[in-house]
């Protein structure tokens, strides 16, 4: 017969249930379980000696062909833009097969995920499950970035480059069909979904079209190549015709026009605006204004996330290196100083909290840290809770809405912007099983396990020579999904529809599956999730003060952050 047990005992056995609250690492962010799909109480499944998932109990006789899943993640606390709730998650063929209640339908009620003899179990009790992160601003300077990204909880990377060439050190472009081919062939080796952007800086369409046909699934306009109104207009025209996204780094020096001229050249066409605050580059001092445009999908790069007492100082040296500038040339120094403004960086914090900035990415090794996208997102959320208090949208004694808003910034929103939300970006049935499992005490900092296409690619692991997996040193190590031909079947390469239709995978002899992006055009900020605000932004030309709908946006820099030195003693 069922027996009543204390709520604390239940949470220790099966993880938190409806109404329980969980602190995210050492932040002030508190989430509350909204609902629990694993019940009824007393029918939960759990693996282990004397536990439920045994033959004839929680494990049915069902074959894989008969409907049993490949893997079940039991009793996980899902943290997603769609909600914060508890469920079992069934994986099959590398995708999310079902979300609900796992078990044996012959002996248990309400089973929606069949556990069979061919089913593996990942214990999600007391763990948080998120969708894998998507970093949409990558300079492919060195392949070692991928390891750092994966072990931080990222499962998809989009950007451009060919290695430490000077064009790549500054701009996110893989220019030309030949380079695109070499990079896609290299992508076969890595346990990471990869996607490549071509160079969009051209005033005539032929060379841009050539890159999209060669596999570029996005196009990058960068000021170092000349982001003129003519180039903007031409690039967006090709993008509209071929359904790829355009990312833009605008003209810091205002040589070919001001922000108003850039907006005019866009003609209301969808565009992903990189580092929209401006420290990473863009019309000085007021590029931040474009986050109020519906057709602009605004993102931040992570060095300005959040605003701290060290942000300004580190940016000047960072910028000189990244853009091949010379400290002995006064004009180069002036260029650098024009981009770093404490007023706009402070406003950026608040615009994220309002949902006016929609995406956070890294700008890897080119004024950004590839392994800190997730950390800095949650540091920003924590800083804003401390400084601004609860959001008006919150209900109950929790931060669920704020947490859902911020997780969307590195999962579903970049996926929508780049036409791959049908494949990744959230925990929903049918999407790829690119998932991250977290110990709540280490949430946002050090994943416990990362799955690529349903296969464990990395995990916290102890001494391989020990008699059990837990003895020190415990740290994140590559797992079976990161080796051999498993890599080819666990991760994918995203390409344009034109390249997919032409059989780019066969042409280049690619081992990984290629998937086409779609639906990147004609969308606006309103298509993004929980980050749709379009305030009217004004920037004072002399003081750089930022106002949104007339309200001054300012905040103090943080002197101390969570998710920092406490987690990185070694």
UniProtKB/Swiss-Prot annotation:
InterPro entries cross-referenced by the UniProt entry: Amidohydro-rel, Metal-dep_hydrolase_composite, Metal_Hydrolase, Urease_alpha_N_dom, Urease_alpha_subunit, Urease_AS, Urease_asu, Urease_asu_c
Annotated keywords: Cytoplasm, Hydrolase, Metal-binding, Nickel
Binding site for substrate: 222
Binding positions for Ni(2+) 1 per the UniProt entry: 137, 139, 220, 363
Keyword Hydrolase: yes
GO MF annotations, alphabetized: nickel cation binding; urease activity
Alphabetized Pfam families for the sequence: Amidohydro_1, Urease_alpha
Pathway in which this enzyme or protein is active: Nitrogen metabolism; urea degradation; CO(2) and NH(3) from urea (urease route): step 1/1
SUPFAM superfamilies assigned to the protein according to its UniProt record, in alphabetical order: Composite domain of metallo-dependent hydrolases, Metallo-dependent hydrolases
HAMAP family the UniProt entry points to: Urease_alpha
Complex formation: Heterotrimer of UreA (gamma), UreB (beta) and UreC (alpha) subunits. Three heterotrimers associate to form the active enzyme.
Record's protein name: Urease subunit alpha
Species assigned in the record: Ruegeria sp. (strain TM1040)
